[in-house]
C-alpha cells in the first residue's frame, strides 16, 4: 500500500499549489468535493464485484484509472479537467483502499489482526509522507504537472508487487481456508 499512497500524498499536499499555478483556485474546493464523490461512488458500486471474487479486475482497473489520472495532470488547463481528475482520483482510491484493507483482515488470523492493521496503516502513512516529500523535491526542478505524472510510476510498482506477491499470497490463504 505504501507505493499506492505516494501519489496520494503528492496530490493532497500540492494540488492547491498546482491550482494556483494554473489559475484554478476558484475550483479547488470543488476538487476535494469531487474527490470525495468519487470515493462514495466507488463504495456504492464495487461491493458486488468484490463479493463475486473478481478482486483482480478491481485492482487493475482502479490502477489504470489512477495512472491515467496522474498522467493527465500534464495537460491540466481547465477547471473541468481538475474536477474530473479529483473524481477519478477518488474513484480509484475508493476502490483500492478498502480492497487492500480486506486483503489484510481476510488473510490474517484473528489474534494478529491488530498488528496487521497497524502495519497496513503504517505503510499508508509512510507512502503519504514519501509522496509529499518527493513532490516537494520535484516541484522546483521539473514542475508540478510532470511531478504528478511521474508519481504514476508508484502505481505501476504497486501493481507489480500485487501481481507478483500479494495476489498469490491472498489466493493461497483463501484456498487453505476453504
Label each PLM-derived region with a short phrase.
Residues 25-26, 110-120:
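Loop-to-transmembrane helix entry/capping segments in MFS-fold secondary transporters
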Residues 74-85:
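Helix-loop junctions at membrane interfaces in 12-TM secondary transporters
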Residues 57-72:
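Structural signature of the two symmetry-related core transmembrane helices
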Residues 137-155:
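A membrane-interface helix-boundary motif in multi-pass transporters
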Residues 1-32:
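Extracytoplasmic gate region of multi-pass secondary transporters
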Residues 95-108:
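Intracellular juxtamembrane helix-capping segments at the cytosolic ends
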Residues 42-54, 139-140:
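Helix-to-loop junctions at the C-terminal end of transmembrane segments
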Residues 151-178:
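Multi-pass alpha-helical transporter architecture, strongest
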Amino acid at each position: 500500500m505504501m507505493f499506492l499512497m505516494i501519489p496520494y500524498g503528492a496530490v493532497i499536499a500540492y494540488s492547491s499549489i498546482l491550482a494556483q499555478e494554473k489559475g484554478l483556485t476558484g475550483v479547488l474546493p470543488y476538487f476535494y468535493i469531487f474527490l470525495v464523490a468519487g470515493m462514495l461512488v466507488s463504495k456504492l458500486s464495487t461491493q458486488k464485484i468484490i463479493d463475486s471474487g473478481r478482486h483482480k479486475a478491481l485492482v487493475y482497473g482502479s490502477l489504470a484509472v489512477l495512472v491515467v489520472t496522474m498522467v493527465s495532470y500534464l495537460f491540466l488547463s481547465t477547471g473541468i479537467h481538475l474536477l474530473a481528475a479529483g473524481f477519478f482520483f477518488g474513484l480509484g482510491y475508493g476502490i483500492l483502499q478498502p480492497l487492500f484493507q480486506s486483503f489484510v483482515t481476510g488473510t490474517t488470523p484473528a489474534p494478529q489482526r491488530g498488528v496487521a492493521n497497524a502495519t497496513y496503516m503504517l505503510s499508508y502513512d509512510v507512502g503519504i509522507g514519501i509522496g509529499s516529500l518527493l513532490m516537494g523535491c520535484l516541484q522546483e526542478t521539473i514542475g508540478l504537472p510532470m511531478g504528478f505524472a511521474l508519481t504514476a510510476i508508484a502505481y505501476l510498482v504497486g501493481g507489480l508487487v500485487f501481481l507478483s506477491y500479494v495476489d498469490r499470497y491472498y489466493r493461497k490463504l483463501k484456498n487453505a481456508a476453504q
